[in-house]
A protein has these predicted regions:
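Conserved ATP-binding subdomain of kinase catalytic cores across diverse folds
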Residues: 1-74, 100, 104
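Flexible beta-alpha connector loops of hexameric P-loop NTPases
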Residues: 29, 83-89, 137, 141
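Activation of the activation-loop gatekeeper triad in protein kinase-fold domains
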Residues: 67, 128-133
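AlphaC helix of the protein kinase catalytic domain
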Residues: 72-84
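Regulatory N- and C-terminal appendages and interdomain linkers associated
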Residues: 86, 94, 101-104, 125, ...
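Catalytic-loop of the protein kinase fold
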Residues: 104-114, 119
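Conserved protein kinase catalytic/activation segment
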Residues: 116-128
Length: 226
């Protein structure tokens, strides 16, 4: 499973039981996921990401602050709300910034969609983080981030079709890989892919030409010294 890559279980008995899928193993797996969610919530809350603030984790039960709407009731999920184009654009922009902030904290949600984002009185709040992965330690992190961003685009694009032409995911990941991504990095929503296939013959010819030029340069230098 993509989410579990690079997650370590120190107890060898638990690890074997989880691998076999026994009752004890399933319980251990559930506890591990709860622990992973707690760790992710604390980490992201410290980074300023819009997630519910964890209050306590007692006997395997995670208590979090209530995410409320303007009336003080439990905030709805995005999939239960209809937006104007302006609202969709604004909420999409907010969530793209949160995805960036998460990535800068080293975390990829891994299952981000309209079903696990609440609309609080002051804006969207991201929930459901047991499957969050370490951006640097999981080989599937890039694919997960691209999927998260695509889910946001597809959902809000229903209300603001202009979003369907954006390409924030690859842009964000490229900046992250180059080590220049920060929560303040301006994004364009555009990304130029190199769709042209690489011609290995041309590449090898360029290498040979460079090698010949270097050999000629060395020969000239030797002739000058003589």
């Amino acid at each position: 499973m993509d989410y579990t890559e690079n997650r370590k279980v120190k107890n060898s008995r638990q690890a074997r039981a989880m691998a076999k899928g026994t009752k004890f193993g399933r319980e251990a797996q559930e506890a591990a996921w709860q622990s992973a969610e707690v760790d992710a919530l604390y980490r992201l809350a410290a980074a300023g990401v819009r997630v519910p603030r964890p209050q306590q984790f007692i006997d395997g039960v995670l208590l979090m602050e209530l995410v409320a709407d303007a009336e003080g009731d439990a905030a709805p999920r995005l999939n239960d709300v209809v937006f104007t184009p302006e609202q969709a654009l604004a909420h999409h922009a907010t969530l793209i910034k949160e995805v960036v902030r998460m990535l800068c904290a080293g975390v990829v949600h891994g299952d981000l969609s309209e079903f696990n984002i609440l609309l609080a009185a002051d804006g969207p709040v991201i929930i459901d983080l047991p499957q969050a992965v370490d951006a640097a330690g999981n080989n599937h992190a890039q694919r997960m981030l691209l999927r998260d961003v695509t889910n946001l685009k597809d959902f809000f694009g229903q209300f603001a079709p202009a979003l369907l032409g954006t390409d924030f995911g690859p842009e964000i990941w490229a900046l992250y890989e180059r080590g220049v991504l920060s929560p303040e990095t301006p994004l364009t929503g555009r990304f130029q892919r190199l769709d042209k296939p690489v011609n290995l013959g041309d590449v090898m010819r360029e290498i040979d030409d460079a090698r010949d030029e270097e050999a000629a340069r060395r020969l000239r230098m030797q002739s000058g010294e003589a």
